[in-house]
Design a protein with these regions (language model features):
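A late C-terminal transmembrane helix in Major Facilitator Superfamily
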Residues: 177-210
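Pair of pore-lining "gating" transmembrane helices in MFS-fold secondary transporters
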Residues: 52-70, 157
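C-terminal ends and interior cores of transmembrane alpha-helices
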Residues: 132-146
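Helix-to-loop junctions at the C-terminal end of transmembrane segments
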Residues: 109-123, 209-210
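Interfacial helix-cap and linker-helix signal at transmembrane-aqueous boundaries
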Residues: 79, 117-118, 204-213
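Intracellular juxtamembrane helix-capping segments at the cytosolic ends
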Residues: 165-178
Length: 237
């Protein structure tokens, strides 16, 4: 465990050094008066009057919530299933991490295909497709009885595809719709909605996991994704 953390920390420092060496130096600029935080927040919220930006905010909420659900609860589900099957905690934890690895690898290979699609379609349509994949990926997990069963991995492949699709759709939509005059405030609010999604997914998901079961967490995210899809259809047509 310690070795893993040291390796990750070393990779972060190495990446930081490469970025520091490779970034082009900026040109001198004149300092201008900073707007108060309240005005920046107000500008970000006011931008949600544009239904396309509101859709991007909602998608960010889901996409970041997806991330924490997959990273935390898929892992936890695999670990608890392993312990219930009689594995020792270390081996069960490894099984749980394997589920997360499957979702991550699936997303890694799927993302280039999703990027090609998003470049060729209307961004609203692309977001609807992405959120539909997210809804399907999370809801299909409901049919899994044992996450460690030999054939269960395919459902976690779909889960990884859905999770990365939601993230890609939200990011591409806000990059197009954020107005130049208030781009910083709008992108900041977009990320704030994402942070709220992380908190929501952690808090509510944890309670559902304990009180109902692992499936409930994924069904919750899938159902919320369906709501975003319906809103996207309204915005598009």
């Amino acid at each position: 465990g310690y070795l893993t953390h040291f390796i990750v920390a070393g990779a972060c420092f190495l990446s930081a050094a490469v970025v520091l060496a490779g970034l082009k130096k900026g040109t001198p600029v004149n300092k201008t008066e900073q707007l108060p935080l309240s005005q920046l927040v107000g500008a970000g919220l006011a931008a949600a009057r544009n239904p396309r930006i509101a859709l991007a905010y909602a998608s960010a909420f889901i996409a970041r919530g997806d991330l924490v659900v997959v990273g935390t609860f898929a892992n936890l589900w695999g670990t608890t299933a392993g312990i219930a099957a009689g594995l020792d905690p270390a081996e069960a934890s490894a099984k749980g991490r394997m589920l997360f690895a499957i979702t991550g690898i699936a997303g890694l290979f799927w993302l280039p295909l999703m990027g090609i699609m998003l470049d060729r379609v209307n961004r609203i349509t692309g977001t609807i497709v992405c959120m539909s994949l997210a809804a399907a990926g999370f809801l299909v997990v409901n049919v899994v009885d044992d996450p460690l069963a030999p054939g269960a991995w395919i459902f976690f492949v779909f889960l990884g595809i859905g999770q990365i699709s939601a993230f890609a759709g939200a990011a591409t939509l806000i990059s197009q719709e954020a107005p130049i005059a208030s781009r910083g405030a709008v992108v900041g609010m977009f990320n704030t909605f994402g942070a709220v999604g992380i908190l929501f997914g952690t808090a509510v998901g944890g309670r559902l996991f304990d009180s109902i079961g692992p499936h409930a967490v994924f069904v919750m995210v899938g159902a919320l994704s369906v709501l975003v899809v319906l809103y996207g259809l309204w915005v598009r047509w």
